[in-house]
C-alpha cells in the first residue's frame, strides 16, 4: 500500500516571533523530530514542504525526502506536497506537531480504509462557548466534540477533489473532504501530538522530552 507522509512546515510562525520548526529543541531543530517520527513508518515516502529560503536546510536535514517549496497559505503548501507524490494515500502532518508518536501514522492509515479519510481526535478538557460580540450565545456539549490533530490521512483522489472544489483556505484538510459529503473517521489521537505554536508550547515540548528520557 503506497503512503506518502507530507510534513507541512512552510508557515510564517507569527505566534512565536521566529521560525519555530527550525528552532533548537534539545539540540536539534524541531522539524528534525517530526522527520524522525515519519521515517519510522517504512516504506512510506517522505515529503517536506518548507519555505523557499529553507529548501537547502531541509535537503540537509532529510536527504532521502522529496523537498518542495510551500505557498502563502496552508492549502497551497498541501497542494504542493500532493503534487510531488503519486502515492495512493497521503498523511498530512504539521511539522510543528513534532512530538507526535510514530504509531499515529499507522493508526490513521488503518482508520481511513473504510471511507478514505481519517483524523486523530482527543477529548476536550475545557468547556467550549460560542461567542458573538463578546457575549456567550451558546455552550456546545463537550462530550460531542474532540480536538483534532494531525496526521490526517486521505485517499489521494479524495484529497485532489477536495482541493479542486474550492480555493478557500482552511485550518485542516478534513474540512474540505467533509464538504464532498465524505464521512471522515476519527481515531484516537495522542496528547504528545500537540501543535507547538507559542513559547509556552515550546517549553512544554522540552519538558516532555526531558521526562521521556527519565522514563527510559
Whereabouts are the PLM-identified features?
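Short active-site oxyanion
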Residues: 42-47, 116-117, 192-193
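Structural beta-sheet core signal
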Residues: 5-7, 48, 92, 117-120
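SAM-dependent methyltransferases
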Residues: 1-4, 172-174, 191, 199-216
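N-terminal glycine-rich phosphate-binding loop and ensuing alpha1 helix
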Residues: 1-53
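Conserved core of the sugar-phosphate nucleotidyltransferase
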Residues: 58, 99-187, 216
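Short beta-strand-to-loop acidic/aromatic patch adjacent to the donor-nucleotide binding site
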Residues: 87-97
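Conserved N-terminal catalytic core of the sugar/cofactor nucleotidyltransferase
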Residues: 31-88, 166
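Residue-level signal for inorganic ion chemistry
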Residues: 7, 31, 81, 93-94, ...
Amino acid at each position: 500500500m503506497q503512503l506518502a507522509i507530507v510534513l507541512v512546515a512552510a508557515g510564517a510562525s507569527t505566534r512565536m516571533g521566529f521560525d519555530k520548526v527550525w528552532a533548537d529543541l534539545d539540540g536539534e531543530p524541531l522539524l528534525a523530530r517530526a522527520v524522525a517520527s515519519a521515517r519510522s513508518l517504512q516504506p512510506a515516502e517522505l515529503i517536506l514542504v518548507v519555505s523557499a529560503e529553507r529548501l537547502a536546510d531541509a535537503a540537509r536535514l532529510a536527504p532521502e525526502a522529496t523537498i518542495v517549496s510551500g505557498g502563502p497559505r496552508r492549502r497551497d503548501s498541501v497542494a504542493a506536497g500532493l503534487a510531488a507524490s503519486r502515492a495512493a494515500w497521503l498523511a498530512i502532518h504539521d511539522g510543528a506537531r513534532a512530538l507526535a508518536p510514530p504509531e499515529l501514522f499507522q493508526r490513521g492509515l488503518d482508520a481511513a480504509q473504510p471511507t478514505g479519510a481519517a483524523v486523530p481526535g482527543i477529548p476536550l478538557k475545557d468547556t467550549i462557548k460560542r461567542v458573538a460580540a463578546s457575549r456567550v450565545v451558546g455552550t456546545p456539549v463537550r462530550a460531542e466534540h474532540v480536538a483534532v490533530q494531525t496526521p490526517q490521512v486521505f485517499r489521494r483522489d479524495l484529497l485532489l477533489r477536495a482541493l479542486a472544489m474550492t480555493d478557500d483556505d482552511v485550518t485542516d484538510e478534513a474540512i474540505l473532504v467533509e464538504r464532498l459529503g465524505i464521512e471522515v473517521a476519527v481515531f484516537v489521537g495522542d496528547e504528545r501530538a500537540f501543535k507547538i505554536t507559542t513559547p509556552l508550547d515550546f517549553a512544554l515540548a522540552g519538558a516532555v522530552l526531558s521526562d521521556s528520557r527519565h522514563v527510559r
